[in-house]
């Protein structure tokens, strides 16, 4: 990290790091670092369907410093424990953890443009799904409704 002047009160916030393996990201976050979790596409989410990401850490002050530097309000901080991956799976304890959800335009505050472009290329629109091939189901017996069907008879 770049040094700052001795009289300066501003220290640039840490940049969240992405990891190829989620377990490495969890370990980094549990040690107090900022982990940029992988993007996920959520069909049914709080802010509607789309790509979601998050910055995770066990250090709430470090996470808030990053958020404030991106004009994300402090109220965006959420509490969610982290798994202690250094323990056996059976009886694994949970460690204090925090995250800030990112969606829509906020994704560009943390994720590089190439990562966002690759994620959008992986998106599949409902119109491209083929009935009967299995890609129209997210679990057995559940079909995705045609978006033009809507509520009939209104």
What does each model-found stretch correspond to?
Residues 75-138:
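Short, compact, well-ordered microdomains
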Residues 145-154:
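Long, low-complexity, intrinsically disordered segments
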Residues 137, 142-145:
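Intrinsically disordered, low-complexity repeat/linker tracts enriched for polar/charged residues
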Residues 29, 33-36, 41, 47-48, ...:
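Long, contiguous binding/interaction regions
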Residues 58-82:
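A short, structured beta-strand/loop element
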Residues 43-56, 61:
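Terminal, regulation- and interaction-focused segments at domain boundaries
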Residues 1-42, 48:
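Charged, low-complexity intrinsically disordered tails and linkers
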Residues 14-18, 62, 106-107:
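Exposed alpha-helical structural elements
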């Amino acid at each position: 990290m770049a040094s700052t002047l001795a009289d300066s009160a501003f220290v640039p916030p840490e940049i969240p790091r992405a990891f190829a393996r989620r377990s490495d990201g969890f370990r980094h976050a549990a040690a107090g670092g900022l982990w940029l979790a992988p993007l996920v596409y959520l069909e049914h989410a709080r802010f509607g369907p789309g790509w979601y990401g998050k910055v995770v850490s066990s250090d709430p002050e470090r996470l808030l410093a990053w958020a404030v530097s991106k004009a994300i309000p402090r109220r965006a901080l959420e509490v969610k424990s982290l798994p202690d991956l250094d323990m056996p799976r059976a009886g694994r304890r949970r460690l204090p953890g925090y995250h800030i959800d990112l969606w829509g335009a906020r994704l560009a505050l943390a994720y590089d443009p190439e990562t966002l472009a690759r994620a959008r290329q992986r998106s599949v629109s409902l119109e491209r799904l083929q009935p009967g091939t299995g890609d129209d189901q997210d679990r057995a017996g559940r079909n995705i409704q045609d978006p033009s069907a809507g509520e009939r008879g209104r």
